[in-house]
Amino acid sequence: MATEGGGKEMNEIKTQFTTREGLYKLLPHSEYSRPNRVPFNSQGSNPVRVSFVNLNDQSGNGDRLCFNVGRELYFYIYKGVRKAADLSKPIDKRIYKGTQPTCHDFNHLTATAESVSLLVGFSAGQVQLIDPIKKETSKLFNEERLIDKSRVTCVKWVPGSESLFLVAHSSGNMYLYNVEHTCGTTAPHYQLLKQGESFAVHTCKSKSTRNPLLKWTVGEGALNEFAFSPDGKFLACVSQDGFLRVFNFDSVELHGTMKSYFGGLLCVCWSPDGKYIVTGGEDDLVTVWSFVDCRVIARGHGHKSWVSVVAFDPYTTSVEEGDPMEFSGSDEDFQDLLHFGRDRANSTQSRLSKRNSTDSRPVSVTYRFGSVGQDTQLCLWDLTEDILFPHQPLSRARTHTNVMNATSPPAGSNGNSVTTPGNSVPPPLPRSNSLPHSAVSNAGSKSSVMDGAIASGVSKFATLSLHDRKERHHEKDHKRNHSMGHISSKSSDKLNLVTKTKTDPAKTLGTPLCPRMEDVPLLEPLICKKIAHERLTVLIFLEDCIVTACQEGFICTWGRPGKVVSFNP
């Protein structure tokens, strides 16, 4: 393995790298691509994307992967680290004319060895539902492009649903669909359901239920990616206007926002326990945002160009009770210590969530996440307890503030929330740090907006509560938000006036929305390696490997430490 050094060595593509847990190795036999293995001419093409699904096959080899390259879409058995990829036998291959696949997502809930539901978004705005095992096309949504003519940027099944899915477009709109409903032969007409700062949600105005069930307009410019929280209750969106916006998906409330240091945000992901969100974008940074505190807690600088994908590694994220261990020795010795008292993936979430601000027991917490970028580099990062639970928070006055716009003055006279002296961790902020304006509301009802949209169509929306107060913990938080959820439809003139007060992106630097670089900790990557010739577009953490892909159409498997074994061709 080449060492970091001169220009030639710096530009050399790495095939292995070492972290504290051991050696990761590129497995050439586990590389997937087009059958001819010829590098794809990626100029002007949409990013290569990869989706995985496990079919619970009796043979124990139930992993399948789908990837798009140019106008082509492939569906293969994924043999992982143990067996060589057989590129001559794709289960399904499709070549499209006039449009290109841009993204895709499997329904893990309904997947079986005989059937799997795969959504595919396209560059011209359509969404296709296919079954690559049965090799039949089920349905086409937005076929005539009457709903949206712009490129599909992200498509995902709604967690826990067999029929609902969400689609984002470069127009800045998102649409909620039901596979059981048709789209109609004319352009849909909408009526306003909910409106807030820089977002609006509309329902489809129709006598019979039809797609789309809901239309979200979020921010300005393209909506580049969205991600559901691990519990499926919240939705994080990143847009070309540089904003991260986090919504309560069911009640359609804005929970919190964050602004990039520069340029658009391109990617987003949640920590396994749902407490942190990481974004990447055109500022070449990764940014860590606390879901509980609604604030930036760290930035990471390691990339030399735009960050295209961020992802948490649930298999390396850990929490250890007791005194944090001190260590000096070899990687092998560290590996032995690492397995003592460590909880992985499942228990990490439960143990972190059980802790509260009054728990004084020492805890050693490490979240591992990764990023890939257009600079062809893979970076791995550790988010540790000295960042998560700082004893001396940087710029205390800044990090203890709550972002409220001019129409909602908080308790403090200077526009900042009151800090609590002596706390090493900032107190939780209100569940929303932006005014959850609603166009129509009934304070007495506790129904979910999303449930109402799905079950009742348009006619009953006027009676739904659009501002559920269940999560309001303190009366002062309730007052601080001026009970905006109780605005009736008669107050629409005032509401429109309020929603015109948008955050000026140019004025966010130095505020809690976008702290200055010196006001938050700056992370350095554990490793930062050039691993491809072309820009990287995929990063997925699996139990025994890491999967990356580049724009040339090569999907690479990196075996984790101790997982690389002799394989059978």
From Swiss-Prot:
Sequence intervals crossing the membrane: none
Main location: cytoplasm
Annotated segments matching region Mediates XPO1-dependent nuclear export of WDR20-USP12 complexes: 450-468
UniProt repeat feature WD, residue ranges: 94-138, 139-210, 211-252, 253-331, 332-426, 427-523, 524-559
Gene3D superfamilies: YVTN repeat-like/Quinoprotein amine dehydrogenase (2.130.10.10)
GO cellular component: cytoplasm; nucleoplasm; nucleus
Effect of residue 306 to A: Impaired binding to USP12. Does not induce plasma localization of USP12
Ranges for region Disordered: 405-445
Cellular localization per UniProt: Cytoplasm; Nucleus
Entry-linked InterPro entries: WD40/YVTN_repeat-like_dom_sf (IPR015943), WD40_repeat_dom_sf (IPR036322), WD40_rpt (IPR001680), WD_repeat_creC_regulators (IPR051362)
Outcome following mutation: residue 464 to A: Induces partial relocation of WDR20 from the cytoplasm to the nucleus
Subunit-structure text: Interacts with USP12; promotes translocation of USP12/WDR20 to the plasma membrane. Component of the USP12/WDR20/WDR48 deubiquitinating complex. Interacts with USP46; contributes to the cytoplasmic localization of the USP46/WDR20 complex. Component of the USP12/DMWD/WDR48 deubiquitinating complex.
Name by which UniProt lists this protein: WD repeat-containing protein 20
Native source organism of the sequence: Homo sapiens (Human)
